[in-house]
A protein has these predicted regions:
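C-lobe/activation-segment region of protein kinase-like
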Residues: 192-288
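Short acidic/His/Gly/Ser-rich catalytic and metal-binding motifs that mark active-site loops
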Residues: 75-80, 141-144, 194
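Conserved kinase catalytic-core helix
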Residues: 94-95, 101-112, 144-179
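A short beta-strand motif that forms the metal-chelation/ATP-contact edge
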Residues: 130-135, 190-196
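Juxta-kinase regulatory segment immediately upstream of eukaryotic protein kinase catalytic domains
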Residues: 1-47
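Hydrophobic residue at the +6 position relative to the catalytic HRD Asp in the kinase catalytic loop
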Residues: 181-185
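Conserved ATP-binding subdomain of kinase catalytic cores across diverse folds
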Residues: 38-137, 170
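Short beta-strand micro-motifs enriched in acidic
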Residues: 121, 186-188
Length: 289
């Protein structure tokens, strides 16, 4: 796990039931005790997402509340890649990657979770299990849950989401999976982002990235709550009022492609992390795979 040394250097290491953990020093004792309790009896902890055979998200409650994310890597090739850092990318769905991403962007933004610890079960040269400990956003609900309960809120909520996208870009990163379950609403109405397994650490082109975010957000989920023409109207109003310097020749083709068509995760990753791939996409957005 040498490729993570720069990220774990400031953390305190501890072995717990055969697992290696790196904890934020301020909370090491509390987190270590909570992790021990979880390892002994995971079934006694509340889940924060629908459990999957190899993945889970759990609530840990001590002096504070924490999120513990768990991921088991079933395939030897992925175990090898994550242990040795053979694929240093920001678009893979695993907790090693989310740890890397949040370590890169959390210092820039108050709207993302803070990393409290990272753990794994490994035997050279394979990592079998991953654990990620994060700060918990208490009394928040997802945009998805809010709109399921109150679909009529979409017209008031969407401009706030667009402003969150703009703030994200101004802070220099692009969340590649900005769907309504990954955006939380706080008790004061502020919005926050979670699930950073897929993230670009820099913004190649603001207008291109905003086109992706606003188009993808509709195609992935929000179309359940608002008609396409109504969504277009809200987008135009936001762009007119709050993005007067937007270059529409860049924004529009990207927005239209993501608004109405599915685009693979591989393509999303490549065009948001590589200037060369982004330029290629811009030349033929309608036909680019």
């Amino acid at each position: 796990m040498r490729h993570l040394q720069d990220l774990t250097r400031g953390l305190l290491s501890q072995n717990i039931h055969g697992l290696t953990f790196h904890f934020e020093p301020r909370y090491r004792d509390e987190l270590a005790a909570l992790v021990r309790q979880f390892i002994i009896a995971p079934e006694q902890h509340a889940t924060l997402d629908v459990p999957e055979p190899n993945r889970g998200v759990f609530l840990l409650e001590g002096e504070r509340k924490w999120v513990l994310k768990y991921n088991r890597l079933p395939h030897w090739k992925k175990q090898l890649q994550n242990y040795l850092g053979l694929k240093r990318v920001s678009g893979l769905h695993d907790l090693t990657n989310e740890f890397i991403n949040l370590s890169a962007v959390s210092s820039r933004s108050i709207n993302v979770p803070r990393v409290a610890g990272f753990g794994y079960r490994a035997r050279f040269p394979f990592i079998k299990e991953e654990y990620l400990l994060l700060g918990f956003f208490d009394q928040h609900c997802s945009v998805d849950d809010r709109l399921i309960a109150c679909p009529e809120d979409s017209r008031n909520l969407l401009p706030q989401v667009f402003r969150l996208f703009e703030q994200m870009l101004s802070e220099g990163y692009v969340h590649m999976d900005p769907h309504p379950k990954n955006i939380l609403i706080g008790p004061d109405g502020s919005l926050r982002l979670i699930d950073f397994e897929c993230c670009a650490h820099s913004v190649i082109d603001h207008d291109f990235s905003l086109g992706f975010l606003m188009g993808y957000f509709y195609h992935y989920w929000i179309k359940r709550f608002i008609a396409l023409e109504d969504y277009r109207t809200l987008c135009e109003r936001y762009l007119r009022d709050e993005q007067p310097n937007l270059e529409r020749a860049v924004f529009d083709p990207v927005f239209e492609r993501f608004l109405t068509k599915k685009v693979s995760r591989t393509t999303r990753y490549s065009i948001l992390t590589s200037a060369r791939h982004q330029a290629k996409f811009r030349r033929a957005p309608d036909t680019h795979p």
